[in-house]
Amino acid sequence: MASTAPIGVFDSGLGGISVAREIRRDMPNEHVLYFGDSANAPYGTKSPEQVRELSDVIVKRFVEQGVKAVVIACNTATSAAANELRDTYDIPIIGMEPALKVACDRGHGKRQRVIVAATPLTLRERKFAVLMDRFKADHTIFPEPCPGLVEIVEHGQLDDHDVVMRTLHQYFDQYDLSTIDSVVLGCTHFVFYRDYFRELLPDTAAIIDGNEGTVRHLGVVLESLGKLAPEDAEGSIDLANSDTSARIAQLAQSLLDR
């Protein structure tokens, strides 16, 4: 596989565009093929079997397009399908996971109180339970399923301040937020809500997502294989979606340009 081959990035819908943007920032010479499965969004309320089947169809298409690696820019699909995809395809498959370690390490040994905002399926899967087990003895962790946030992005309502804040309050008013050290955004859609979370949370609370760490890992893997794009290559992002409507195409481009 040539170093100039593209990187496949996919998500249940439009959230993974936040990861594609991170690749563009950190690895500007790379050619990214982005596929959003908005016709089947959200994944977070589906069964693991459904998510595995949908993910396999997408990765198979990427392989046919000659990608050198695939980034599962979806915490839910990572939880449900990453291991099976790695067993099936002979290319690097890079997944996401909630950046819980980053949040806990902020305390430098002091007990941290952390909310993990994610989809219901991400929080139900064994992968998250294993992650929780690593940290729950020394930290207080609150898993918070937030199914409605994916739909707001997919429906193009991200700029509707009242709708977004009303939805966030539904999930987070149960907490004394003044006691929270960090909120982990455990879904790539949620990264687009960072400014809203900043409005909701006290200044002392950190907002953490896994995009930066995932893209850093992608770079390390490609470098180890000698597959980083040459420095004179012109990077690009091609957007595709299972929902071929003009509305989704315009929304995807607006999120990429955001």
Curated annotation (Swiss-Prot):
Transmembrane segments: none annotated. InterPro entries: Asp/Glu/hydantoin_racemase, Asp/Glu_race, Asp/Glu_racemase_AS_1, Glu_race. It comes from Bifidobacterium adolescentis (strain ATCC 15703 / DSM 20083 / NCTC 11814 / E194a). Its EC number is 5.1.1.3. The active site is at C74 (proton donor/acceptor), C187 (proton donor/acceptor). It catalyses: L-glutamate = D-glutamate. Signal peptide: none annotated. Substrate binds at D11, S12, Y43, G44, N75, T76, T188, H189. This is Glutamate racemase.
